[in-house]
Amino acid sequence: MLRMATLASGSSGNCAVVSDGRVHILIDAGISTRRIAQGLKGLGLELRHITGVLITHEHSDHVAALPVLCRQCGAALFTAEGTAFALCARWPGLEERFRVFAPGQRFALGEWEIGTFATSHDCACPAGFSVEDGRRKLALCTDTGYVTPQARAGVRGAHTLIGEFNYDPQMLRTGPYPRQLQARIAGD
């Protein structure tokens, strides 16, 4: 049975684990590799057990651990082409680790089928994911300004839906962001 555990969620870092006891993946790696390893240990896992890392987008709170994680773990990185391009520009040398997809594409990862869908966020090519093991479907959608038609279709039929969005109107108004960015975040 598919199980999901959140290791971190929020502006300071995002990382989740999906496992069925045989296949283990991370969704995003926005916290330190040390924190990821500690979280995995609490689940009875180690970094070496990770089969792959699904990356939603290139913002630091979703990918901060990638360079170190890639050195310590042999897992492939699955992300949209635009996101892979942005990450390779930031961290040359990761190119061979990426398995790229176009949002809407499906692919196999172990015995699972991974679905991908476009989300709405201010980055190169943001994506959400569904994970299916033949019996259950889990879907994850993060940092999206609104639910795109593709996201709606991608999460349809999910037994478990994880949404990660943090938005505080008061923090936004009083924070350091310029007005134009505040308007975009607020959906104006």
Where in this protein do the model-derived segments appear?
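Conserved beta-strand hairpin/beta-sheet module of binuclear metal-dependent hydrolase folds
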Residues: M1-L43, A127-D143, T160
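Structured catalytic core of nucleotide-sugar glycosyltransferases
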Residues: A5-A16, G52-L66, R71, A84, ...
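Active-site neighborhood of phospho(di)ester-bond hydrolases with catalytic His/Asp-centered motifs
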Residues: I27-G30, I50-E58, F78-E81, A139-D143, ...
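Active-site metal-binding motif and surrounding structural segment of the metallo-beta-lactamase
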Residues: T33-T79
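Short, well-ordered alpha-helix to beta-strand connector turns
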Residues: I50, E95, A158-H159
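Metallo-beta-lactamase
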Residues: A80-R135
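Active-site glycine- and acidic-residue-rich loops that bind
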Residues: L140-R152
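Cap/insert and terminal regions of metallo-dependent hydrolase folds
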Residues: P149-D188
